Curated annotation (Swiss-Prot):
Class in the EC hierarchy, top level: transferase
Name of the protein this chain belongs to: DNA-directed RNA polymerase subunit alpha
Cited function: DNA-dependent RNA polymerase catalyzes the transcription of DNA into RNA using the four ribonucleoside triphosphates as substrates.
Cited CDD domains: RNAP_alpha_NTD (cd06928)
Keywords carried by this UniProt record: DNA-directed RNA polymerase, Nucleotidyltransferase, Transcription, Transferase
Database matches in SUPFAM superfamilies: C-terminal domain of RNA polymerase alpha subunit, Insert subdomain of RNA polymerase alpha subunit, RBP11-like subunits of RNA polymerase
Region (Alpha N-terminal domain (alpha-NTD)): 1-233
Domain notes per entry: The N-terminal domain is essential for RNAP assembly and basal transcription, whereas the C-terminal domain is involved in interaction with transcriptional regulators and with upstream promoter elements.
Gene, per the UniProt record: rpoA
Catalysed reactions listed for this entry: RNA(n) + a ribonucleoside 5'-triphosphate = RNA(n+1) + diphosphate
């Protein structure tokens, strides 16, 4: 006879793969009611809380706003942006990167035409972006960021909005790699008990993650969130004290102290580079992607840094330091 406090747990978990991005996950048996309890929780996490990558900003040569059209390109800018939102990406080494797309027509432009390095993978390279009908060269700069769930462009307002150049188009970001998820609860039976549940989760992803792994991550998130209820009297663990950081004082000085030309200084501030420590972590390639910053300005920056024993491409641990508060950055921006 089963004790009152003994709950059945699933004896089998079956993953029925329909294809690489679509699968049905079956859990049984569950106590009556637990099918809907777990199904609802997992479905909400899969839809709203899964991390992933998305294109969040687009800059097209010759285009100032999304209501434009491009001569020699079949699609208007709005349709191009919608197609770019459908590009499925994986990014391993960083939280943010910038990619470029350069294509000369006539011909079809696909996700495979996006130039990328080893840290970025496009899992749907045949995805259509646009069609060039004339002898036009399309040049596009794409910002890719990691995030979670769905984030509207308006909610990503930041301090650099006032300095953002015309033509940098913001996209609503759907970071979640889960495209569709649904569940049903069916009847299950164990020996003489016929009042049990069987949970069937129907899951489809964009290809950047396998359905089985998506379920596993969602279950891990759920487990971490409810673990605190196991022992409500448990004291919160004190946060470890951070050791005092040893940082060269010159890195904490604003870039204005480098006495660069007005053009170079403004270009750096437009990219949220307010301190010398921010600057030395950038590479030459990254700086050359900065609007209005050319090779002459880059040479000037390198020479000034070299005179102080610094260089571009340096790696700084624990930057920015705790002592560099947000209000300090705001003050630097207002200088």
């Amino acid at each position: 006879m089963t004790a009152v406090n003994d709950f059945l747990t699933p004896r089998s978990i079956a993953v029925n793969a329909i294809n690489q991005t679509h699968a049905k996950v079956v859990l049984e048996p569950l106590e009556r009611g637990f099918g809907h309890t777990l199904g609802t929780a997992l479905r909400r996490i899969l839809i709203s809380s899964m991390p992933g990558c998305a294109i969040t900003e687009v800059e097209i040569d010759g285009v100032q706003h999304e209501y434009s059209s491009i001569e020699g390109v079949q699609e208007d800018v709005i349709n191009i942006l919608l197609n770019l939102k459908g590009v499925a990406l994986k990014m391993e080494d960083s939280e943010e990167t910038t990619l470029e797309l350069v294509k000369k027509g006539p011909g079809v432009v696909t996700a495979n035409d996006i130039q990328r390095d080893h840290s970025v993978e496009i899992v749907n390279p045949d995805h259509l972006i646009c069609t060039i009908t004339g002898d036009t060269e399309l040049r596009v700069k794409l910002k890719v960021q990691k995030g979670r769930g769905y984030v509207a462009a308006d909610s990503r307002q930041s301090e650099d909005d006032e300095t953002r150049g015309i033509g940098r188009l913001q996209l609503d970001a759907s970071y979640s790699p889960v495209r569709r998820v649904a569940y049903v609860v069916e009847a299950a039976r164990v020996e003489q008990r016929t009042d049990l549940d069987k949970l069937v989760i129907d899951l489809e992803t964009d290809g950047t993650i396998e359905p089985e792994e998506a379920i596993r991550r969602a279950a891990t998130i759920l487990q971490q969130q409810i673990a605190v209820f196991v022992d409500l009297e448990q004291d919160a663990k004190p946060e470890p004290k951070q050791e005092r950081e040893e940082i060269d004082p010159i890195l904490l000085r604003p870039v204005d102290d480098l006495e660069l030309t007005v053009r170079s200084a403004n270009c750096l501030k437009a990219e949220n580079i307010y301190y010398i420590g921010d600057l030395v972590q950038r590479t030459e390639v990254e700086l050359l992607k900065t609007p209005n910053l050319g090779k002459k300005s880059l040479t000037e920056i390198k020479d000034v840094l070299a005179s102080k024993g610094l260089s571009l491409g340096m790696r700084l641990e624990n930057w920015p330091p705790v002592s560099l508060r947000d209000d300090d950055r705001l003050n630097a921006k207002l200088r």
